[in-house]
Amino acid sequence: MLYLKQLNRICELNLRHSRRLSHAHQLKADVKHRQIDKVLIANRGEIACRVMRTAKKLGIRTVAVYSDADKNAVHVEMADEAFNIGPAPATQSYLNKSKILDVAKKSNSQAIHPGYGFLSENVEFCEQCTSEDIIFIGPPTSAIRDMGIKSTSKAIMSSAGVPIVKGYHGEEQSIEKLQAEAQRIGFPIMIKAVRGGGGKGMRIAMTQSEFLQQLESAKRESLKSFGDDNMLLEQYITDPRHVEVQPGLSEETRQALGEAAVRAARAVGYVGAGTVEFILHRVTHDFHFMEMNTRLQVEHPITEMITGTDLVEWQLRVAAGEPLPLSQEQIVRRGHAVECRVYAEEPGAGFLPRAGTLHRLVQPQPEEHVRVETGVRESQEVSVHYDPMIAKLVVWGRDRNEALAKTRAKLSEYQVAGLETNVNFLLRLSGNPAFVAGDVHTAFIPQHEEALFQRPSAARQSARALSAAIGHLLMTQKNNTANKSSKGIDVGPSAWRPNYQLKKTISLKLDDKEMKVTVEYIKLNEYRVQVDGGAWQQVEASLSGDARGVRLTTTVDGERRTVGLLAHQNQIHVYDEDGQTVAELPQADFRGGGAEVASTNSASSPTPGVLERILVSQGDKVVKGQPLFVVIAMKMEYVVRSTRDGVVASLAAVKPGDAVGKGAEVVLLEPEN
């Protein structure tokens, strides 16, 4: 797995050529055989659906739990039985251990599969399952405890001869002690929650001056996510690779990583699926233990695709006391696999998560070498309370180039409306020459920022504007014909009348650029088109479509091109091989009103979420860059800072704990007299 990180987990496109399975050896534990006829999945979304699919294949009945926000979720419909466990906030539902155990007993479930996240690495929950004689599908409590507390795991790994990074892993947690240890280690410093994971409770302090602020932010986020704000400090290795066992490594390094992973597992008496992660120096290939995820890994489909295994089936069999189906020596690696996490997020705004309704969701069709792991469908909500993942696209190829080429082809099949996604970013990333060559590290995104976030060329922008304009007119005409009330351009030869417009100019906004497209009717399916005052072009155009959506085919100067189209509110969505573009039409064309423009004097929430803290009061003087308030969204903390010097004129009528929408004004500033 290659993590491409910018600060926290922002966007991950994960690849693995091979990975030593976490049960690389069979522990000689005296495990009694137990029948599992029914399993409760203590999770939601795509991982709950993934576990259910294998359980059903094995003839095991499945039980879902769900919050109020998930009552119509896919995993609820997929399960044989489903039980509500509380309100939307995870602390009152998916993290409520007693409610989940009550459901397990009520449903007569012999086992609980925790998935990943939530309670998957919770020691107390594992202990409670054991005390209730319910099988926890995961490692022993002792292994979760030892590996879950990062300071403890570092000490154990050091004793086991597994290399670790220079740092502080002690119990004393006073601010003064942590500041002193940071100075001893030297900057830049990585600040990490001892119970953390997934980038939560993790910050980088590049200098001593920003250490305290980053420490406090990491502690708050850790307390919210894991109920523990203890921290460890590590030397920050610049531009490392974050590795398990994967592509771009020599066989010697791969073997050394595998042996270190086995030593790590043996040191804590590990049983079950897990993943040992390392930090690797790009030049020397020296590596250091980072952490062990004591659960099924998010990227486990990569391992399954290149080994032909079903790791969830293995988990269920091992939990029932059966031996592993294969030994390490029997596992054969073949080919290369790529996993893309498709997220509702805005890459151009620091990968801020987005929440709302998926008005349109078309995904690639699963096939032999293509998997789409998802837990949402069209018309459903992506909630502010949970991770904004829409799907995991997993593609296999004979080698890296083939796998990436197939990945780009499948990514281009996505059609999403209602929420911004990272699909366009993933397309650019997976086609980036340095990425294709395997020159990947944790600073890859900022290093290649210009290429990864570049605007489309003028020619591509013009082609998309043309498609949006003609598509808008043809779809409008088609709908009007169906409604027997034709308006505007009419493409039907028998319906065309002299009093109808032969020419129409449409105003569009693409990527914040205002454009005008003039379309002149010639005859059926033929037009003359001018984009932004440029040369007139002869265009042949026609619509087609099926259950997967409307398609527009145009021919310009002998070049034939087909794109997907969707009309949603005042937007025309254009889907092509480079991703998705949204063309906005004037609001007056649809609702008779214009969009409001937010005041530049206000500080607004960058994302839907919950207001965590307001850091200023009315009348306070503030300087540019000063933190004003904190929003929690999708389990991550976002600090909103002032963009100017000024004075706090007023605060919105919201308080910590209140929900806020994207763009909601929280602090109003005015110039200092």
Describe the residue ranges of each PLM region.
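Structured core elements
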Residues: L40-I41, N84, H113, M190, ...
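Eukaryotic N-terminal low-complexity, Ser/Thr- and Lys/Arg-rich leader segments
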Residues: M1-I36, A459-D490, E672-N673
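Short flexible coil/turn linkers enriched for glycine and charged/polar residues
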Residues: Q183-I185, G196-G198, K224-D228, D239-R241, ...
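Structured functional modules or segments
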Residues: G593-N673
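Structured, non-catalytic alpha/beta "coupling" segments that mediate domain-domain communication
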Residues: A111, S120-Q128, E339, A349, ...
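N-terminal beta-alpha lobe that positions the nucleotide/phosphoryl donor
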Residues: L2-V276, L280-H300
